[in-house]
């Protein structure tokens, strides 16, 4: 037997044949007939016009679809760019809006608390309806602004006394400073003393010159501001200390918030003075001629250089002294000084022409146009405080009084904003560009350097 028959068995062995499979093969119908194999294939004939129309429609539909896709893409890109731009704009002012919202919530807390207390007495349904009305009545949030009315400075001015013609030795030595402070402390507790109108000898920064105590030799007086702890002592000391001598100099004492009235009938104008004339010489000269009747002497000086402008105002206690002093017109003060004084009665300021911008009517119009928007939002009490600040306070405080303060702690400042504490920071329009200082030494160095460079290139000159 072969290996094949040993594994699978012989073909004649009917015992190993499966009957179900054998029955399937017995029931077969034989081979496929010839007529089914030779039958022609069915083909559908499409007319030429219909085919071209369908192909054209397909092409037009595809073109329209591509154009629509392009338009859709362009619109989507535009929307995307707009969204990014809006997000940028929102994010730039996000921090300031947050802080402004906090300020607004703090301002609205007080009236809301009072309203809630009133609503508690009513029914619950009423409170729900009120809440709905509050939500519906909300307006767009505005930028929080606080108007600077200089209330702290005004309160400080009520306790401040101006002292003129003070001996400059008060700044130089501590014993003199203590003596000056003791003169005013007998009327009440002193909070602080500020010295102004100091003339220095060297052209260095004022803080450095003050630390070195290098004062100008020809200007031996200065002004001071004495701040008391309370208001009453400041009012008491003015009439008692005015025209008193301190270290051989007559003091001119006046209150900052409540100055003494200026009476033109008791005042004279003194002209043709030396630019370096001192107040003390005028005090002594007119006191000797009017039996110590001088109330105050004021030499008009330049704000920057602190040098006199050549004229002064002298106020007396009595009008009879004015007539006595008028007899001294066209006469020198002493034999050493040959300048003849020009003495006349003090007059009120003459009104400028109606065509001048300094006329009262024109200045009122300009002031009203600038301040109308701001003053419309202020109450009567706030306007009173603002007007008081502009008449009483100094030059720097007057410039900032009434302006809105937008920059607060934690808020981002924009370019060009003036910020308190940063000296010399102005807007881009007013900011000056610093130019380098050109000196003879630097120009000589540059010329020598250029000549050496040219010699190296071209050789020495023959």
Curated annotation (Swiss-Prot):
Which SMART domains does the protein's record reference?
Answer: RRM
* Single GO biological process annotation from the record: maturation of LSU-rRNA from tricistronic rRNA transcript (SSU-rRNA, 5.8S rRNA, LSU-rRNA)
Q: Give disulfide pairs as residue numbers.
A: none
Residues covered by the RRM domain: 159-258, 266-348
Q: Which InterPro entries match?
A: Nop12_RRM1 (IPR034777), Nucleotide-bd_a/b_plait_sf (IPR012677), RBD_domain_sf (IPR035979), RRM_dom (IPR000504)
**Superkingdom:** Eukaryota
Q: Where is composition skewed (Acidic residues) in this entry?
A: 51-68, 127-136
- GO molecular function terms listed in the Swiss-Prot or TrEMBL record: rRNA binding
From start to end residue, where is composition biased (Low complexity)? 365-377
Keyword Mitochondrion on entry: no
Question: Basic and acidic residues bias: where?
Answer: 69-79, 87-120, 137-147, 439-452
* GO terms for cellular component: nucleolus; preribosome
Residue ranges for the region (Disordered) are 27-147, 331-462
The UniProt keywords, alphabetically, are: Nucleus, Repeat, Ribosome biogenesis, RNA-binding, rRNA processing
Q: Which CDD domains match?
A: RRM1_Nop12p_like
Pfam families for the chain: RRM_1
Q: What is its main location?
A: nucleus
The cellular location(s) given in this protein's UniProt record come to: Nucleus, Nucleolus
Compositional bias of kind Basic residues = 337-350, 429-438
**Function field:** Involved in pre-25S rRNA processing.
- Protein family membership: Belongs to the RRM RBM34 family.
Protein's name in the database: Nucleolar protein 12
Which species is the source of this protein? Debaryomyces hansenii (strain ATCC 36239 / CBS 767 / BCRC 21394 / JCM 1990 / NBRC 0083 / IGC 2968)
